[in-house]
Structure formats: structure tokens, C-alpha cells
Amino acid sequence: MFTPTDISGEPSAVGTQWTPYLSHPVDFGAQHFLEAMLNVISQPNINSSVIMRADIISDSLNMMPNIMGTDKANEGFIFDTHEGPVDDDKKDTDKDKNTPVPPNLQDYEPRQVEVTPCPVKRVIVRRIIPRNPQNDFSVNQTCIVHSDKPLWDSDGKETSEGAKIAISYISHHDHPKSCPYYLPCVKAVLLYFDGSAISVYYEKYTDYELSAEQEERCGRIALHLLHTVFRHSSGQKAGYKKRVHHDMIIDRIKFQDRYIYLKQKYAHSLVSSWVESTDPRKHVFEDLAIAAFLIELWGQMYKNKDDIYFYDLGCGNGLLVNILIKEGYVGEGVDARARKSWQTYEPEVTQKLLEKIVVPTVLLDQMVGQAQYLPPHAAEKRLAEANGLATDPRVFQTAGLPENAFLIGNHSDELTCWIPLMDRPFMVIPCCSHALSGEKKRFPPTSSDPEEKSTYRSLVGHVEQLSSKIGWQVEKEYLRIPSTRNAAVIGRTRVEPQMNIFEILYSEGGGEGWVERARDLCAKSPRNH
């Protein structure tokens, strides 16, 4: 139960310059508070959805990786590219002109505050990067760990038990009007743990009086900060373990910088020109994030954009195809039903969006193989059907995909389990659960962990198993996208297969009914996901 107490009328316990705001009793220890606060220092997005991340500029104990000595130390936002062609895109986007830059951005020197019972034990300078640099600017901030006892020994091992600890935040701006909107308009913020309670204090400007609105915001932020500290410290005591781990394949900073770049370049025009009945903001920002991840993934795999030809199978509204082609990649999108959006894209994109059904080659081979066991009339009919599918211009052929093909399945439903079996590197983001026949199916859990037994987790686990059986080294990433179905299964490195494609098809119950269900999709309304 979170029931904070207003302590604004009480004397300050940490020095007369500090104004008390709120307090809350605790039953966790100093080590839990310290661990939680260090996590919040490195991830300020925990406190505000406006903030994307923090780049650590310096750490007096050198325990956090920092950006000093890199180009990132000099600017609030830098787009790093792994290849030459993107530089041409930079010329078309004058983002610096539109991005507000605070006057103290190159002020790396730590700032100081006094906390009466607690000397300084550690000083960290970070840069806060907002999600939307066009609306909010970055700011450097000193984060100081104060304590009445030593918190780390000479080997860096924590020794905080029984300590009083204060964490102060001092933003590097010299006037309250330079304070970003996502921060309280004060000189410094303090979170104080004394063993029995946690409290929030502000050091206010002596020559600037807050407006009623600013004062109200300070109160709301104090409440939010206190709640975050209480919740995360309690979680540390309870032995909280992260259930989902992000950024296992692509570095978080590289992904986020790429995402910001794409969002600044495309988001406004894509949202304003949306013609589908679905929520434009969800789809636009989700596909921009997926595009950012793919571009960084391909940067690891290929030297140049020309080295890859992508296929987005089950591409839906074609938005992801549109973004990738605009970014200089070559590829196609395939879906059983055209969408209204297709005609709103530029001609070079529209002509790459194909209204076709996907029939995996192995099903045609299976039909031909089965014909020899059928009576002559039935065999002739089966062979004619296979030949008709192989030559039908409305059927996308998976045979003969180029060697440099990369397959994408972004919530592609019926195709999700098929894509890893198509003998080309791939990334699939599972959504709805279907067997190789196209029929809806709930797969059994692949783990004894209770957290992994949902329909969705079971589907993801099944896709991983299929990928492994056919000979892919399976990688999984939980994408930073606005969707709960955000697991991406990736195959880009070949290993020894455990089964061949026909063995897998047999073990999965076969693909009987796939063609009929694929054709039926053409007559149905598209799914809104």
C-alpha cells in the first residue's frame, strides 16, 4: 500500500536549502534503495515516458560505461550510420535546425550540492535524451550518491547495509526557463533514505518564484518520484528478476538513435495521410521501430544496401515496405489482399506491393509426390492442380528466391510458422497462432516455466523449435514496440539441421488445406493488427 505523507511543513533533515515535500515509511534496506536508484539513474525512462534514455558521460567510480571520448559527448542527438548511402538521406533532413539544443549541453563538469548528514560517495554525469527531440531538448545532469557510510569497498563490492543514503539530481541549466518540461523547475532534486522512510526534497531557485502551475507540477513529480522509488526498492527486496530482456542483438542506443531519425523523417506525414480504419499512431510508430531494428540488424549482416533483397510476407498495409524502400533498401511486400494504403504510396513503392497468395514450394512438391500413389484420374487432377499453382501469376513462388533474400513476417499469422522453413534468413514477429495447414492452432508450451505457458509464448516457442529443427541458429529479441506481441524470432546463421522439410511437414500434421485457406483469405476482410 502506497500512502505518502505531506512533510512540507516540517523542518528539513538534510539542510536548510532543501524544501521537504513528501515522505513514506519503508521496510526495505539501504542496499535495496541503492540498487533501485542506480537502476533509475541509468534508465530515467522509468520515471517518465517522455524520456527515451540516459547516456552516461562520466562516473567517478567508472562502474557505468560512458560516452566521453566519442562523438556522442558533443551533441544532444547524433545519428550514427554504419554505411555510406545513408549520408545522402542526411542531406535531405535538416534535423539540427528543428531540434532545440540547450545552452549547457557541453557542460560536462559535475555540479555540487550539500546534504548535511551525508558526504559524497559517487558522482555520475548523464545526458537525458527525450523521445521527441523536436518537442523536448536533451539536458546534462549530475547525479550524486551521498551516504554517511562507505557504500563500496576497493573491489567495487557493495557495503551499504545500515547506511543513510541520499541521491541528488542537479540539471546543467543556469536559469529556470532553460529547464526541460519533463523535469521539475528547481535547482536540484533529492531522494533521501534514512532507514525508516524515503523522502523527496527540492532545492528551489532563490531568485525565481514558481507559478501556481509549476508548483503543482513539482508536487505531482515529487509524488511520482517517491512512488517509483518505493516500488522499485520494494521489488529489489522481493528479489525481482526481469522477465523480458531487451537489446540482446542490437545495441539499445543504436536502435533508439535510428528510431528517432526515422520518426523525425516520416512520422508526421505517415500519420496525417493515413487512410486505413486502424489507429495510425500505433501502426506508424510500431513499423518505424521495426524498420529501425531491421536496418541495424542488416547493418550487422551486410556491407551494403544492395546486398539484400527483402520480402515482407503478409505485409498488410505495406507501411514497413514503404519505409524500408524509402530508406534505400530493395524489396517487395506480398499479401493476399490489397489495402487502401497501397495506392497512397509513391509509385516505386506501390509497384512492389503484390496481391498474391503464398504457396510454399514444398507443398507443390508434396502434391506431385502424392500423385504417384493415386488412381490415374485422381493423379492427373492432382498434377494439374500443382502445375496450375506453379504457373498462376496470382501465386507467390517461394522456389528460386534469390540467395540474398531476407524474409520478414510482421504479425503474418498463417505464414509465421512457414517463413523459417523457406531456406532464407528471416525475422518473424508472431501474433496469431496457426498450423502449417493454415488452421488456427494452440501449440503446447515449450517450457515448464509458468510464465511461458500462454498461447502467445507457446507460439513463439514453437516457431523457435521449427527454426532450430530446420537448421537455423535461433536468436530472439523482445522489440521495443508499442505491442504486447513483440517477440522477434531471427534466423541468420545456418547450423546442422535436425530434420528435413518433409519430416517437419509430416511431424506438424501436414499442410493439407493451406491452398484453400489462402484463397479464402482473398475474400475476407483484413485483420486489424
UniProtKB/Swiss-Prot annotation:
Stretches the record annotates as Disordered: 78-107
Keyword vocabulary terms for this entry: Cytoplasm, Methyltransferase, S-adenosyl-L-methionine, Transferase, tRNA processing
EC nos: 2.1.1.211
Cellular component GO terms held in the UniProt record: cytoplasm
One example of a Gene Ontology biological process annotation: tRNA methylation
Reaction it catalyzes: uridine(44) in tRNA(Ser) + S-adenosyl-L-methionine = 2'-O-methyluridine(44) in tRNA(Ser) + S-adenosyl-L-homocysteine + H(+)
One GO MF term attached to the UniProt entry: tRNA(Ser) (uridine(44)-2'-O-)-methyltransferase activity
Main subcellular location: cytoplasm
Record carries keyword Methyltransferase: yes
Basic and acidic residues composition bias: residue spans: 80-98
Pfam families: AdoMet_MTase (PF07757)
UniProt KW Methyltransferase keyword: yes
Annotated InterPro entries: tRNA_uracil_MeTrfase (IPR011671)
UniProt subcellular location: Cytoplasm
Described purpose of this protein according to its UniProt entry: Probable adenosyl-L-methionine (AdoMet)-dependent tRNA (uracil-O(2)-)-methyltransferase.
Family label: Belongs to the TRM44 family.
Name of this chain's protein: tRNA (uracil-O(2)-)-methyltransferase
Species, as recorded: Yarrowia lipolytica (strain CLIB 122 / E 150)
Gene field: TRM44
